[in-house]
């Protein structure tokens, strides 16, 4: 599937009538597993990227180059469309333009640009937002930076939990007026908040998370939520699995005593072993 085709799949999801959960992906193995299990979309979150690439928490330490390189590896490994958390665009509006270009070239189906002030400012006790004017500039730069018009650009705001619901709506409407393809919200914890946002905007909505009492897909779909994230449990589970395996080995366990290891069949599937063997026969065996 071409990069353009992957982007069209994401656009179809956003313009549809359903709400889906994406698979949280962060490397070649996780994206192949998500694809094999039938997920329609992958989500490459900033926290997962920081942990997978750097082993660090999500405090804006990862660079654009590191993020794009990891996205490129996933694009090569599978054809599952991926929505990328591009954080603040790695600088000002000029940097945002470059961010879009790099992630587009890396095969992202879509990306989010947020209005959080990143990295955290000196002396700041809690998250802060950039001004609406600067946020608009970043969104405009993102839209103008894409070479493929099919690349999905989402305006993202965390204003609901940082400033106010009214500010979140004002920012969302401003980003909508700029021409973004959808709106990404974090910090929504109550139905009346989502109801107000849905009533004040017209674009597809992506939720960065929602409490259990708001998890009904029918309710979310009726509020134009087309994608609802469920956190990044896969990388957390992988971390625990590696820890338990190494702990057992360090404690004297024999490899055959280890629990939770994948079957040979699953390992072969994730490695696409059958296809690799076919290529070896075709490319390297005489007379093939």
UniProtKB/Swiss-Prot annotation:
Question: Catalytic activity annotated for this protein?
Answer: oxaloacetate + H(+) = pyruvate + CO2
Q: Which UniProt keywords apply?
A: Decarboxylase, Lyase, Magnesium, Metal-binding
Under which name does UniProt file this protein?
Oxaloacetate decarboxylase
Please name the source species: Bradyrhizobium sp. (strain BTAi1 / ATCC BAA-1182)
One GO biological process this protein is involved in is:
oxaloacetate metabolic process
Stored Pfam families: PEP_mutase
Q: EC number(s)? A: 4.1.1.112
Is-annotated flag, keyword Ligase? no
Keyword Lyase among UniProt keywords: yes
CDD domains attached to this UniProt entry: ICL_PEPM
Q: Which family does it belong to?
A: Belongs to the isocitrate lyase/PEP mutase superfamily. Oxaloacetate decarboxylase family.
Question: So which cofactors does this thing need?
Answer: Mg(2+)
Q: List where this protein forms a coiled coil.
A: none
* Protein residues bound to substrate: 47, 156, 232
Q: How is the cofactor bound?
A: Binds 1 Mg(2+) ion per subunit.
